[in-house]
Amino acid sequence: MSEPKQAKRYIVSGSVQGVGFRYFTQNAAERLHLSGYAKNLPDGRVEVYAIGTPEQLAKLRSALERGPWGASVSEVREEQAAIDPNYANGFVITY
């Protein structure tokens, strides 16, 4: 029996815009079979919303903490979120 899905929202701080962070996140999420989105925030942080099993989400968080080459992640804040059916199929970059 598979684990039930849940949703999490991550706010990633540091040097995370202009370094391919959203594309890195999309690639990691797709490899983990997660759905959701990544978007730049006006204050320089990146918001990531993901739906998956606790194990998949933990692996995504590890990837977010590393970031792509050229990024410098100083903090990843995590919070539970409601599952939004609008983002239940596939992982997208939003603007």
Show where each model-derived region lies.
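Intrinsically disordered, low-complexity, mixed-charge
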Residues: 1-95
